[in-house]
Amino acid sequence: MFSIDIQGKSMSLCDPTSKIKQMQQQQQQLQQGTNNGIQKDQQLPNMIINGNSNSYLNNGSNLQQQAVIQQSNHKQSQIKYNSPLSHQQHHQFKIGHQNKLEYLRQQQAQKYNQIYQLDPQLQQQNQMFQQHQYMQNVQMQQQLLYQGNQEVFPPFNQIANGSAQNSILLQQYLSNNKGQTNNSNRENGGNFHSEQSPKSAAGSVVSGNGSNTQFAANILRNSNIIQQQNEFRFQQIQQTHQLLHSLVQQQPQPLSQQHSNQSSQSSNPQSQSPLPLSISSQQPVISMANYFNQPSQQSNSLFNGQQPTMFNSSENFQQKNILYSCVGNPNNPYNHHINNPYLQEKRYYKSSKLPKIKKENKPQQAFSDIRPSSREKSARFHLAASINTILNQNGSTSVNTQNNENMVQTLKGHSYSAVTEKSNIGQQEVNIPTTSKTQTLIKEHSLTNINSASKENNQVTLASNSNQTSKKAYENLMSAENDEEDKLKCIRYFRYNLGQLLHILGKKEIYFSNLNSKKPIKTFASITQQLGQKHMNLLSKNTINIINKVKKIVATKGKYKYRERFNFLHSAQLKSINYDVRKRLNQIQDKKVLSNTKSKDEEESSDDDETPVKSKSNNQNAVQQTDLAKWKKYNRLDPKTKVFIIKGGYGDLRKALQERGWVENPDYFSPCFDLKWTCKVQDIDYDNLQENQVVNHFDNNQTFTSKYGLARNLRTLIHSENIDVYKFFPRCFDLGDLQEFEDFIENFKVAKAESLVHRFKDMLKNGIESIDDKLELKIRLCNEVASRKFIDFYETVDFIFNYDVLPCVSPEEWEIISKDEFQLDNKKIEFYLERLRSHPTFKHLYYSNSQSQKQHMNKRKNSHRISVNHNHNDPIEEESAQSSTSLKQDSLQRFSSKSQELLDLCNQTLKKSSEKDPQHHLNGYRNIWIVKPNFLSRGRGIKCFNSLDKIMDYVVGKETQFVVQKYIENPLLINNKKFDMRQWAIVQDFCPPRIWFFEECYIRLCSVEHNIDDLNNRFVHLTNNIVQKYNKDAYADKDDLMMSQEQFAQYLKETEGRDVFYEEIQPKLKQMVIQSLKSCQDQVGARKNSMEFIGYDFMIDSNYQPWLIEINSSPSMEYSTSITEELVQRVLQDTTKVIVDYSMAKKGTKKNVDTGGFKLIYKGEKQTKNNKVLASYKK
């Protein structure tokens, strides 16, 4: 006995009736509550019927009064318990519960089918068990239906089960008043419900009330009629179950065999053998609701013009009519499963009319009466009907029934890309005229796979077996243009986000259970061998549905939102890497590393030092004015004078505004201004801003100026602009978000394996002394883990969703990959080799045939000869040289085959990575990641790590929110030093945005040469001037750490021989600025007179590919060097030209306004007709 977990629901294989028992208990509780209410009204008649009749007959007057009182009580409760409407509702309620039980059996049958695909032997083992349970359930349903109809009228059973004395009195009294009873029945219409309830009638009879004898007669008469109806209904239901049981057992046949069986059965109806009663071992048992609600195999053939073999003779057509009248007719009041809310989504028809099976001479009308299913949608039916319409318009009436059936099967198989393994469709051809209308119609329904197999005959050929048909459907699905575009979006979105994909597919619990338990290494290769290659080429219908769900999620824009600090103590990921959070925290606290974290987090997040905050007013006696006109009048200014407020060290901006006649308001908190420029967005009161007041920040600008806000919104470009953000933005994860934290852990593990593949490649290429089993295991495992991200996206979803095979790194695999036993540290290896080279016998083991190593060996030989002064003709030396040469040849032959095999494997893995991963070159050899605090600037709190444990030590326990970003391990170096670029830009309005790009940037260099092995040296990796100035040894000439754009462009031109910067780099910078701001335009609080002056940080790799690092709000405007001094003065003067001269000019004169170095590279124009935004690019 074991349990399974499919689609988030747990179910026991050996106990399929657990849900049924639970529903029966609920039904009994409901029935008990109803009977309790009825029993209160039945108490007095039950005492009369089941008690001592002599005592009640002697006290006739008291009984008559009690009967009158009870009669009035029954009249009041007649509507609640005894009206025909209430009985019908009660009956429907019981039938609804039974249909819900059937619905649960249907769901369980679907789960069994998924399990049987994984383990076919399990189907044979549980076949007899399912047969036994199915027959028991059918009998239980029959008994419930029969008993339920008797429980509708409980007084009948009470009268029949009463004392013998009372029953004798009733029979005698009714026999003496037979004529009177018949007359009263005719007067009352034969309906005892019209006057009085059966309970009060029984009481009146026993109490001796002669006027009520007619009701007692009606009770017995109607009870006999209802019993006959129940027996007839029971027989009808029994016939239905037998017919359904035989339908389930019937084997599926190919079309050719079915047509042959039809002809043979029609010619000799007596030769038809009875339907088998045993369940087949090849087809799973399905229930009644499952047969009629699943459009598959034989049930599907009823509605596609295809007749099963059992419905050909006249006798079988009578059975079919019984089946339709008992189960499929919604007009039948006993078929409540059609209107049952539990089966509303599962029912096949929406109307009460059944589809008619057309004759063979009218195949073009086979789709006319089919009602669309509420579960399967209706695309294929509308498509088929439209194709038949086109056939009729074109006069193509030569298509036979068999071709029409094959066309339906083709539409099913290709539209859903899944064909069941048990379908035995023969190889047939469908003639479809390739008109333009047909092609347009097919393209609209995304069924582009129905094409002509050849241009001469225009035919579509079906495969002879299910595997080929499924594979062809899968290939056609992959070749569709729309699906290809959606597939690329999914691949780009989930390329590094495995945790999010597992969460969407509902496999999060399996994912965590995989992390918590150390399982054997389970790779995709082993799964392929276990399941067989045919499963790799099949996509089930569930897989297609889940892929469509994934596509919808990708198409849904992610919203930027604030979130609290993530609690790492509850992460199962930390347990998978053997990271003890509490133990690490205690160690960190003992070393007093966390003593100053709170004070550091409270520092300012701006990139510039602010001037000391002045008082609210220089004149304390002056009253603060809230109206700008009154403030100007109070300060004796012209009403046309413009007023500005600047909070921060922007002296050049202040000077530029004063040159234009603007007056500064010294009160930072005053609402009287035309322009306000601050360092922090918190200094702006957006609620009280006037429409014409200009401010230099947008509300909620953290969507693109914060580190995790930028990373989150850039991912939305995949569906809005179809742009792969990972081509220009290094992958970045927010460690404060649980989903992204899990993505980072898995991505770190895969990147670690790929970095080891790089190092193994160089080691095998340069020569290796020996390859033992452990090293070979690690090399092969690293290649296997690194190549998992290259598996096709649809196959990955199929593995995860259907087989619970997760492409993540298991704890056992990570334990092997993360060990330092075979870590190829250059320093350790060089020391090891130098020590071994001292022994002449083992020289041949450590040298390859490379030219550099041969020269190095010759140098060592010469130096050894000079120091020892050996004779060149010494025979001992010649003998040792010959022996070493022979040993070297033997060793090369011994390891050449295995090392060459492993080297080819590494080359193949890295080649795939370079083709499919846009950030392949960023990974490098060390797997370095850079950790940044979210709201800090100027290089504060930024550190580099290549160890997962060290990253956790630095992050866990701090209140600061961190992001981790992939370090660019192949940066372009200037004089062997790392550098980055600062580029200024201005964005206005945001509805739509207007983006200005400053024509000149500058380069910031590090003061120490680049060395990826020295991760703790901030002067090697951080280019911020505020960081580099603390390096007193190298900061003597600070101008050497800056480079202008012209100098940098000239350096690249001299290096490459062409103008790389202006031809390749700068156009890419403009596009990245545009796309980064467009990604968050619906997240920013758009305002007409708001703007943002921002500074972009870019890096360039060794392939001259620029990468966006971050966007800074209120960038530093300090005169740190002579280069920045000149540029800062220019950019602030030109900023005034944009926000004052250009923005405040009239529409007709804006073209002639000088904007200095700022160029408008993007301007969105509103389209008033459809309220859409059109973008126009300007160079």
From Swiss-Prot:
Record keywords, A-Z: ATP-binding, Cell projection, Cilium, Cytoplasm, Cytoskeleton, Ligase, Nucleotide-binding
GO-annotated molecular function: ATP binding; protein-glycine ligase activity; protein-glycine ligase activity, elongating; protein-glycine ligase activity, initiating
Cell location: Cell projection, Cilium; Cytoplasm, Cytoskeleton, Cilium axoneme
Name under which the protein is recorded: Tubulin glycylase 3B
Sections of the chain in a coiled coil: none
Residues in TTL domain copies: 790-1152
Gene: TTLL3B
Annotated ATP binding sites: Q965, K966, Y967, I968, K978, D980
One GO BP: protein polyglycylation
Domain of life: Eukaryota
Chain spans, region Disordered: 177-208, 250-278, 592-625, 853-890
